[in-house]
């Protein structure tokens, strides 16, 4: 299935000069959504845990984990997860950000696939990898709906490791 048919361009969103890749048509089409989850599940069969960032990583990671009967671990911004959390700060172009996971859900030695909607610059994904590795997880794969190739996120992620990155669609 050609998933590009279900991803539309929205000019100047969320700000002027940005060409936003809108996945709403894919989510609104049951066959395209099912195909996407099925393909992601094929790619994630060989890991112990699925991890996804808020919010759109939840859209693809949770149903993939459920399909495979594997756990799904949320990565969120501060103040969004109850209980004890582990935090990782990372730099953005203009400032920094923090990501968190709940303590105790990742076990040392578990293999992980990170599932998200888009790979752009790779900064968020790189921070998630570091957060997981600091907990003893082995990040094997990053599975994405789409990759914005010109933003070089793949190069940022793979320059320090040999994590497999798989994108269902590349722009």
From Swiss-Prot:
Which EC number applies? 2.4.2.7
- Cellular localisation: Cytoplasm
Where does the protein principally reside? cytoplasm
Name the source's superkingdom. Bacteria
Under PANTHER family, the record lists: ADENINE PHOSPHORIBOSYLTRANSFERASE (PTHR32315:SF3)
Look up the record and report any one GO term of the cellular component aspect.
cytoplasm
> Quaternary arrangement and interactors, per the entry?
Homodimer.
Q: What is this protein called?
A: Adenine phosphoribosyltransferase
Entry similarity comment: Belongs to the purine/pyrimidine phosphoribosyltransferase family.
Pathway(s) served: Purine metabolism; AMP biosynthesis via salvage pathway; AMP from adenine: step 1/1
The record's listing under CDD domains reads: PRTases_typeI
Q: Does the keyword Glycosyltransferase apply?
A: yes
Q: What class of enzyme is it?
A: transferase
* Reported function: Catalyzes a salvage reaction resulting in the formation of AMP, that is energically less costly than de novo synthesis.
**GO molecular function terms listed in the Swiss-Prot or TrEMBL record:** adenine binding; adenine phosphoribosyltransferase activity; AMP binding
**What keywords are assigned to this protein?**
Cytoplasm, Glycosyltransferase, Purine salvage, Transferase
Could you say which residues form the signal peptide?
none
């Amino acid at each position: 299935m050609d998933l590009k048919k279900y991803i539309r361009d929205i000019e100047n969103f969320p700000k002027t000069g940005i060409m936003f890749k809108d996945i709403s048509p894919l989510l609104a089409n049951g066959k395209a959504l099912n195909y996407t989850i099925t393909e992601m599940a094929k790619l994630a069969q060989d890991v112990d845990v699925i991890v996804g960032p808020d919010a759109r990583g939840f859209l693809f990671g949770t149903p993939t984990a459920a399909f495979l009967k594997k756990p799904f671990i949320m990565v969120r911004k501060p103040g969004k997860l109850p209980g004890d959390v582990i935090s990782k700060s990372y730099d953005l172009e203009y400032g920094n950000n923090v990501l968190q996971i709940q303590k105790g859900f990742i076990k040392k030695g578990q293999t992980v696939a990170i599932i998200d909607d888009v790979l752009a610059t790779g900064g968020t994904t790189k921070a998630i990898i570091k957060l997981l590795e600091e907990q003893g997880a082995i990040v094997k794969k990053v599975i994405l709906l789409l990759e914005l190739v010109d933003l070089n996120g793949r190069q940022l992620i793979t320059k320090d490791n040999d994590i497999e990155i798989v994108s269902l669609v590349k722009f």
